[in-house]
Amino acid sequence: MAKGFNVAIDGPAGAGKSTVAKKTAEKLGFLYIDTGAMYRAITFAALAEGIDLHDGKALGKLLEKSELRLESSNEGTAVFWNGADITAAIRTNEVNSNVSLVASHREVREGMTAMQQELAKSKNAVLDGRDIGTHVLPDANVKVFLTASVEERARRRHLEQLEKGLPSDFEQLKKDIAKRDELDSTRAIAPLKQAADAQVVDTTSMGIDEVVETILDLVKEHSRQ
């Protein structure tokens, strides 16, 4: 495969994008670019510094003056903010509840998009997010839109939290996911939207390996063209 073969995986919160993207990248020997972790990182940093999350300009300045680094690790992607490892810190309920708001600002979106495009430009990479196929990499070689019911997505997130020893409220998660769907789909800048040329995969009753195999088949199909 030529350099710069990109796989874009989009979908709503809890559809299994990160897990699937990570495994797909592993199987292909591609770089995995965790765009969700990038938005979580700036959300965590803004909360830690007491920055108003409604102030797009202040958030844009925070991103400009900070160093955000992603590194491959055995557990997936390690996230560093100004040299500090914040991989675990960005997965809290507080970050979950605020990341859509932070990501809705044009200043944040533009800064992150430029970073992601730069990372993917010269590499074979798998990226997952909300607007990869429509906005970040509209020319991605393979585009996939993962979806699943709100109930199933909340169940997965609930189990994930419990496995990590974090407190979790299933009913609250359902409400949070439904609210996040609405925020992500209706924001003015790069809303969550299925690309016209994306393959839709409903993961509600599928296992992770099954979803990964479906995507690998799409990549093989594209490579044969």
Curated annotation (Swiss-Prot):
GO terms for biological process: nucleobase-containing small molecule interconversion; pyrimidine nucleotide metabolic process. Signal peptide: none annotated. HAMAP family: Cytidyl_kinase_type1 (MF_00238). It is an enzyme of class 2 (transferase). Its EC number is 2.7.4.25. The keyword Metal-binding does not apply. CDD domains: CMPK. ATP binds at G11, P12, A13, G14, A15, G16, K17, S18, T19. This is Cytidylate kinase. One of its GO terms (cellular component) is cytosol. The lineage of its organism: Bacteria, Bacillati, Bacillota, Bacilli, Bacillales. It catalyses: CMP + ATP = CDP + ADP; dCMP + ATP = dCDP + ADP. The gene is cmk. InterPro entries: Cytidylate_kin, Cytidylate_kinase_dom, P-loop_NTPase.
